[in-house]
């Protein structure tokens, strides 16, 4: 799977690129990048794709793109929040404990930023940890919703081959 840039205005979503070898290009995420530049994602496969083949390729790409955006796309107070599954569980646990104890479990310190430039942030009040956790939860929810909307907007009929 690769991103391709071209000066071709009309991109064929499915194209037999080598009839002898039965090689096909499946293309999606077609975007105009600027004047006379179009980009798209492309996967080369060794058979004429069915709509189900195309659906699997594209939805797997959307799922991975969504997971990456969840993991790497949030900044809090200007610093990256690395939302690995482990960190998501830890943040939820710390927030739930703080709420359940009416703040008695605070302070809680989290590491933001990167491994090269870590930033430690300490939450000392329920309001602070709530603001952080709401930012995390909102980011995850809105990113998931964007992935679902992207999938829902795809017209799979455009991928029916003759």
Report each predicted region and the residues it spans.
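A preference for well-ordered globular domain cores
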Residues: 2-162
């Amino acid at each position: 799977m690769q991103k391709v840039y071209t000066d071709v205005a009309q991109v064929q979503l499915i194209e037999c690129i080598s009839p002898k070898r039965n090689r096909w290009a499946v293309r999606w995420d077609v975007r105009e990048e600027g004047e006379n530049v179009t980009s798209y994602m492309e996967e080369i496969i060794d058979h004429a794709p069915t709509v189900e083949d195309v659906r699997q390729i594209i939805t797997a790409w959307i799922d991975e793109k969504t997971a990456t955006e969840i993991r790497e796309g949030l900044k809090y107070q200007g610093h990256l929040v690395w939302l690995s599954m482990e960190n998501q569980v830890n943040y939820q646990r710390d927030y739930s404990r703080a709420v359940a104890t009416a703040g008695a479990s605070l302070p809680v310190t989290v590491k933001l930023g990167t491994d090269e430039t870590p930033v430690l942030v300490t939450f000392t009040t329920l309001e602070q940890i709530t603001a952080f956790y709401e930012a995390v939860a909102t980011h995850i929810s809105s990113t998931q919703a964007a992935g679902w909307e992207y999938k829902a907007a795809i017209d799979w009929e455009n991928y029916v081959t003759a």
